[in-house]
Amino acid sequence: MNETPLWASESFWKKTAIWVTAGAFLILVVLTMDSLSKTSAGSKRVPAYSVINKKIDYQYNKELHKSMPVIGENEFLFGKEYTEEEARQLVDLGKKTTQAKNCMNCHTLLGNGAYYAPDLTKAWLDKGWISREMREDMMVKFLIDPENNARTFGSNRKMPNLKITEQEAKGIIAFLKWMSSIDTNGFPYNFKTINAEE
């Protein structure tokens, strides 16, 4: 009559641990697949790469109480309409270049990185580029030769010359334009775009 209750037995807890771990792993796999479907290019919150062919803005939505990306009419990057594959390759070059040049050692992207230099999440839309007509040319010149085309945005901090080629600069700009189209739940907050009316 000295029988151990089921809940107090070692085998019960071993089996419970195995089932709980297996269940948690299964839930993790399902959530991962769900997240990937929602954060892949071409989804509702992350537009397809060919969005670089469109005008992109960032406007406050009173109903949602946050700023949202607004995709408008055609506004071709560097005067060219890119196919989805060409756009993907150009954005991919820009992403790989920002990784290779360690841009996040000074900048943030989507809130990740360092806060020494400006956040790049909506850099394509930044008022510091003066006008939409001048933006592409100014960005290319700045990325290739930041010392002679300095954009300090009032901080007096200057970007070092990272020996970025013209093609890499165009890739970075495509990447930044694509990034500005991503729905970031209103981040960065209180951001005023180059298109904003005073």
Regions found by a protein language model. Name each.
Residues R45-L64:
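Short extracytoplasmic/periplasmic juxtamembrane "stem" segments immediately C-terminal to an N-terminal membrane anchor
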Residues N190-E198:
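Post-kinase regulatory C-tail/linker adjacent to protein kinase catalytic domains
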Residues A17-D34:
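Hydrophobic membrane-insertion alpha-helices, especially the h-region
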Residues M33-K44:
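Juxtamembrane/interface segments at transmembrane-helix termini
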Residues G94, A100-L110, I172-L176:
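The canonical Cys-X-X-Cys-His
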Residues K62-Q99, G128:
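Electrostatic cytochrome c docking/interface patches
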Residues M1-I18:
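N-terminal positive-inside, membrane-proximal cytosolic segments immediately preceding the first
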Residues R88-Q89, L110-Y115, K122-G186, E198:
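Extracytoplasmic electron-transfer domains, predominantly the class I c-type cytochrome c fold
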